[in-house]
Structure formats: structure tokens, C-alpha cells
Amino acid sequence: GKNIRGEEVYYIGYKPVAKITPKYFDQLPSSFKDIYNNLHNGWVYFASKANGLLPIEDTIVLSDEDWGILEEIDITSLPFKLHNSIGLFDNGMGDYASIDIKSKDEKEGFIWWHTKAPKLNIEIWAVIDEWTKIGIER
């Protein structure tokens, strides 16, 4: 397709997931499992392998990464634990649209910024839609 400047942009949509999935896969909200199982194993901008819902094997558990921002924020005050938090959408700049797999609200998520405190209480699919749109248009 073409972006608003008329330039060609390419996204990759991966085949639905195979049987091998991360141990947290069954704890994902049903909307994500439906996408991964029945439509795509994520979609990303071809050149960067980002700006899209990550293939399930490329999603991250936030506690598995080194985050400099942890020196600046009080993680004990956050309404989630990093080891229960999954980064599902990489914006290509080190930030993730993320969910808490222990949350009872399947529509809620947060943005995990690598340079500032997370933005809480977002509607996860609205952010994924907007970030995908931004990626395609630029």
C-alpha cells in the first residue's frame, strides 16, 4: 500500500500460530488469542520488524528486559507486576503497548515507555489501532 505521501509501505502478516506458544499464551485476553490463532501471528512493518502486533514468539515479558527507567519510577506503586506484563506491540522506538495478564479487564492495557513512567488505563486495542495507523501513514 501507499502512505499519505504516496510512498510504498509494506507490512507482513504472519500465519496463525503453531502449537508452540509461550507459557503465558493461554492467559492472554481472548481477543488476542483469536487474532493469533485464527488470523495472523502478528503483523509488522517489513523494514523494521516493528510497528505492529508482534509475532507471539517476539512478544516480551517486561521483567525479562533491562529498563533504565526502573531507576526513576517506583515500580511498587504500579498496579501490575512486570513479570505478569506482556509487551505485545513494539512501536519501533523501545516502547510497548502492553497488558497485565492478571488483569480482569480484557480491554485494558498500558503503554510501557522506556524513558518515562507508563501510561496506565488505556484501551489496548485503541492504542494498537492508532499506532498501526501512524506506522502505515509515515
Which stretches of residues belong to each language-model region?
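A surface-exposed partner-binding patch
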Residues: 1-95
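A recognition module on extended beta-rich or small alphabeta surfaces enriched in W/G with H and D/E
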Residues: 81, 89-92, 102-138
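A short secondary-structure junction signal
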Residues: 97-101
